[in-house]
């Protein structure tokens, strides 16, 4: 369940608890002479109390007022005044804010009065728990305890997954539409690592039983957070590695930052045993400038055996001096920019409600939970069309992603990061900073997942939900008539994951007109290579920049790709869907007149999974169509599938390497932008469930081998998008966010413009 960073429940018990909390924060009380309901008021320091509550506090010395903000609630209050402005509306304070000894104090009831004012109705009590709700902290503990008490358990087991086991799809849809409970008991899916061995378990939380225990042959598990500490320790305690560092003039191993990287698969040509649990280590030098990524220790790779917890091999190639130029990215030493405040207020509260993990906004309803591997999973997405809830998508999430590099050198050839499949992007969720990562009016939601020990771990501010202005929805100015235009609003669900040097921002964007967008943004710090060249005018520059761009003295940003795949279990007005291609064509005019040609369209139904695996062609309209449902004029209802709806980098048209590469054969999902498969609840990830060191394609390449029919069936759409990242100077030392966009757009799904009511009289 989410723990919203928002308002306490409006109950006397909650208000009492809040007052007790303030008193236990170490905040000194004093009795103000101001009367509160006929008696003295107990006062606490305003700034400390509000910041502990999660609000931001700003003092304007010129205007002599405080601006206090939290979750879209904005308060402007002056000292010694019983009147404040709450989201632009005047409210009466029981006790004014006062100064004493240069410190502002508020009454112990101030937070309750302001944030319990009744303006905010965002959070609604969940009366019937959703069967897709993520496991609570208690459920995680219970599930792991059941495993630990079983005869199968051994000390040292680690957990890569503890998640809710989804009930059958038809039961979940029935719950979403009618409220009828599912038949399946509450269950937990668990993946355990026993050394290098992977085991899948299923726990029944109702009966408190271990229902299954299944070793998975040949699988290598995910990289866990404690593996980071293992490789750092292995590097720091290796005499051989210390010698290699000394050759480069580095004598303090504590200044070396080791990064744990998966080794990939090269059919033994890399000299690594396939049955070992290994990581490669590329290191950086911490020079105290706050950016060790700018100081790569080039030409040196260590290999660590995670079971032995020691370094087993060193690959020491070229002696390239470590770039030592200070390269901070936090603004130090720069003149600050004066920016006037930009405030977003919602004076009458929010237009959406959150009940448990379910969100309602205008005509949209959906459920969202955070997964430790792929991040947010959106489920049972429906649109209320004039009083009728219509199915659009059963489940949508990031399926997987890969970041392959194109440099063949010893420290680079193996770099092809499966960020979600190898590292778990949900586990690496980056807490969202209000006013920076998301607007001030966002509601921030906590989430709970299991760590590698199986213990529940709370992630603060894991996701943001906010409404925003998005330009005009439509406009027309008829000559001699009043202008007609209306504002477009969007609801955004945002999540950020930091995987090493890169930070990824994912937005699920709901539009009032039925369009659903997915935006993926890459920011953070480029993975750079140390080289000899300082400028492009040196003799070494041509070879140094063969696989990248010279960004700074002795620094090359290597060319690579960011390829994302989204798993979208679309149910367009039901489960009987088909993939349709619509191609605009030029045909001769056979009707007479001066024109010689016409524009027409040709329509084709795609029959099977292998025919559906296609490169993106922007001139073809691709639809997921329900031929059993029609709009008012008889056109079958559809949603358009647009895997690349624009971006700020060159589009990744496919995998930028030869088809004889092992990477190509293991991970074919990245070379096609559209895949459609027949629904199978076990097919979750485009790279397969266990891609680490895999020697074959266990994802979409395998899923489509049977070549099932996708006509009038329950289909899953997999959209691959992304960018080919050619580095540029403006991205160093930190990269402005670069976006790529996916769109799912209604196509004859409605009978008319679905937002005509936006201009209806209120």
What are the functions of these language-model segments?
Residues 51-85, 152-188:
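N-terminal, post-signal-peptide region of Sec/Tat-exported proteins
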Residues 205-210, 214-223, 246, 286-376, ...:
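Extended effector regions of multi-domain proteins
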Residues 154-206, 252-306, 362, 493:
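Exposed beta-strand-loop-beta-strand "reactive/processing" segments of non-cytosolic proteins
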Residues 56-63, 75-85, 117-125, 154-155, ...:
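Extended intrinsically disordered, low-complexity coil regions enriched in Ser, Thr, Gly, Ala
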Residues 131-176, 224-268:
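Short, non-transmembrane alpha-helical segments in secretory-pathway proteins
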Residues 2, 15, 25-128:
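Primary recognition of N-terminal secretory signal peptides and signal-anchoring hydrophobic helices
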Residues 1-10:
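N-terminal secretory signal peptides that target proteins for export/translocation
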């Amino acid at each position: 369940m989410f723990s919203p960073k928002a308002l306490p429940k409006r109950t006397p018990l909650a208000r009492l608890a809040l007052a007790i909390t303030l008193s236990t924060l170490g905040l000194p009380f004093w009795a103000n002479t101001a009367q509160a309901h006929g008696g003295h008021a107990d006062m606490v320091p305003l700034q400390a109390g509000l910041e502990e509550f999660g609000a931001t506090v700003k003092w304007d010395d010129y205007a002599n007022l405080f601006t206090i903000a939290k979750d879209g609630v904005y308060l402007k209050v002056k000292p010694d005044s019983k009147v404040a402005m709450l989201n632009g509306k005047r409210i009466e304070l029981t006790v004014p804010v006062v100064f004493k000894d240069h410190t502002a104090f508020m009454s112990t009831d101030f937070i309750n009065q302001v944030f319990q004012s009744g303006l905010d109705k965002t959070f609604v009590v969940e009366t019937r728990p959703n069967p897709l709700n993520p496991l609570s902290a208690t459920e995680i503990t219970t599930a792991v305890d059941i495993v630990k008490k079983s005869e199968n358990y051994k000390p040292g087991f680690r957990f890569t997954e503890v998640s809710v086991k989804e009930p059958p799809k038809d039961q979940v849809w029935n719950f979403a539409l009618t409220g009828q409970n599912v038949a399946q008991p509450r269950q937990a899916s668990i993946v355990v690592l026993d050394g290098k061995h992977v085991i899948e378990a299923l726990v029944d939380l109702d009966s408190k039983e271990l229902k299954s225990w299944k070793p998975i042959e040949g699988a290598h598990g995910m990289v866990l957070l404690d593996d980071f500490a293992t490789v750092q320790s292995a590097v720091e305690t290796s005499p051989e590695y210390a010698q290699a560092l000394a050759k480069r003039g580095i004598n303090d191993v504590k200044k070396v930052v080791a990064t744990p990287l998966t080794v990939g698969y090269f059919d033994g040509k890399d000299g690594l045993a396939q049955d070992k649990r290994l990581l490669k280590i590329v290191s950086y030098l911490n020079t105290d400038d706050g950016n060790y990524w700018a100081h790569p220790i080039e030409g040196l790779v260590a290999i660590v055996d995670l079971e032995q917890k020691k370094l087993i091999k060193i690959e020491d190639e070229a002696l390239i001096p470590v770039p030592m130029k200070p390269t901070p990215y936090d603004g130090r030493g720069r003149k600050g920019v004066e920016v006037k405040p930009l405030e977003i207020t919602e004076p009458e509260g929010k237009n959406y409600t959150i009940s448990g993990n379910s969100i309602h906004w205008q005509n949209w309803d959906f459920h969202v939970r955070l997964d430790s591997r792929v991040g947010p999973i959106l489920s049972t997405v429906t649109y209320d069309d004039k009083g009728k809830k219509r199915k659009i998508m059963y489940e949508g999430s990031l399926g997987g992603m890969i970041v392959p590099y194109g440099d063949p050198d010893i420290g680079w050839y193996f770099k092809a990061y499966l960020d979600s499949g190898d590292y778990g992007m949900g586990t690496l969720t980056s807490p969202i900073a209000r006013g920076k990562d998301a607007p001030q009016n966002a509601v921030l939601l906590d989430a709970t997942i299991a760590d590698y020990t199986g213990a529940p771990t709370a992630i603060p501010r894991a996701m943001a939900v906010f409404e925003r202005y998005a330009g005009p929805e439509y406009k027309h100015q008829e000559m001699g008539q009043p202008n007609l235009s209306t504002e477009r609003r969007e609801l955004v669900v945002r999540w950020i994951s930091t995987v090493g040097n890169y930070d990824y921002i994912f937005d699920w964007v709901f539009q009032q007109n039925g369009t659903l967008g997915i935006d993926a943004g890459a920011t953070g710090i480029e993975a750079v290579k140390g080289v000899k060249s300082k400028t492009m005018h040196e003799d070494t520059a041509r070879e140094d920049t063969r696989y990248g761009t010279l960004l700074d003295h002795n620094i090359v940003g290597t060319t690579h790709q960011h390829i994302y795949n989204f798993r979208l279990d679309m149910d367009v007005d039901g489960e009987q869907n088909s993939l349709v291609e619509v191609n605009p064509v030029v045909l001769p005019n056979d009707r007479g007149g001066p024109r010689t040609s016409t524009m027409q369209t040709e329509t084709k139904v795609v029959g099977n999974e292998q025919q559906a695996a296609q490169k993106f062609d922007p001139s073809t309209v691709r639809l997921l169509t329900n031929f059993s449902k029609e709009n008012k004029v008889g056109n079958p209802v559809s949603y358009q599938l647009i895997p690349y709806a624009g971006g700020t980098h060159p589009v990744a048209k496919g995998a930028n390497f030869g088809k004889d590469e092992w990477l190509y054969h293991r991970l074919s999902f990245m070379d096609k932008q559209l895949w459609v498969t027949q629904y199978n609840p076990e097919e979750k990830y485009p790279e397969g469930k266990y891609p680490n060191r895999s020697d074959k394609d266990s994802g979409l390449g395998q899923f489509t081998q049977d070549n099932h029919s996708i006509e009038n069936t329950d289909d899953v759409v997999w959209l691959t998008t992304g960018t080919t990242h050619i580095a540029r100077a403006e991205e160093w030392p930190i990269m402005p966010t670069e976006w790529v966009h996916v769109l799912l757009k209604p196509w004859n799904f409605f009978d008319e413009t679905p937002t005509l009511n936006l201009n209806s009289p209120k």
